[in-house]
Amino acid sequence: RQRQMCIRDRDMAKYGYDVTVFEALHEIGGVLKYGIPEFRLPNKVVDVEIENLAQMGVKFIKDCIIGKTLSVEQLEEEDFKGIFVASGAGLPNFMNIPGENSINILSSNEYLTRVNLMDAASEDSDTPVPFGKCVAVIGGGNTAMDSVRTARRLGAERAMIIYRRSEEEMPARIEEVKHAKEEGVEFLTLHNPIEYIADEQGKVKQVVLQKMELGEPDASGRRSPVPIPGATETIDIDLAIVSVGVSPNPIVPSSIKGLELGRKGTIAVNDSMQ
């Protein structure tokens, strides 16, 4: 998505349009900067793309949240003729299970942003990030693989992917799974968290897993995970990273009166994307 945004900005500038990009964070690049680890996509590669856009005349305004810092109405008053919303799917989903509010349970978005964009792993950084020794990452997508591989690089002695389906149903790319295994990541497939247990300080210390089996295919075409009655397992952890999907960022849509949204919170558009 962010790559497509760079291409669109470049093409608009090539056709002579004045393009201004409003970025909520303190660095340009979106998920390419905060979501993808340096070991998979070096920042210098992204910086080259951004510099190319700047050389073509694209303006970048950082630390500006449309819908909060500025409204869409204000942009229209400043004579912007077209507004393209590319705020992404930055709202992390959680499982809403008991104990999920315990300390040291983070979304993959927050964890990767702290490490990638805010340099939380550096001793000189003021941004806190938990350095777990026994880390559970919940989910089976590419972001889950990025999170668990990052945890290994930050010193996790045991790093696990916990996924409710089998490995064959994992949405992560085959090469990402391969790299994770090569780096010592464990895969607990057909397991699903049902509860977190915290210690006296409120920090997560265990996760209770429901063992699953595969049933009939669901709407996605993958076989549905079905709980095995009475089959649970409790494992010790000191950090959980939840990577079970994201939803569209609601800030921009909620700030525009009369905007129609789809079932999943996406902006409804016509054939010309308006």
Each language-model region and where it sits:
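Rossmann-like NAD(P)H-binding beta-loop-alpha module
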Residues: 8-14, 121-156
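Rossmann-like dinucleotide-binding cores of NAD(P)H-dependent redox enzymes
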Residues: 21, 25-56, 60, 148-195
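Glycine/serine-rich phosphate-binding loop and adjoining beta1-alpha1 elements at the start
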Residues: 1, 54, 62, 74-120, ...
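Phosphate-coordination loops involved in phosphoryl transfer and adenosine-cofactor binding
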Residues: 63, 131-134, 190, 270
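Short, small-residue-biased leader/transition segments that mark boundaries at the very start
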Residues: 2-7
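A conserved short coil-to-beta-strand element within the FAD-binding core of flavoproteins
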Residues: 62-78, 190-202, 213-215
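Short hydrophobic core segments
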Residues: 80-88, 136-138, 238-245
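FAD-site-proximal beta/loop scaffold in flavoenzymes
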Residues: 101-132, 217-274
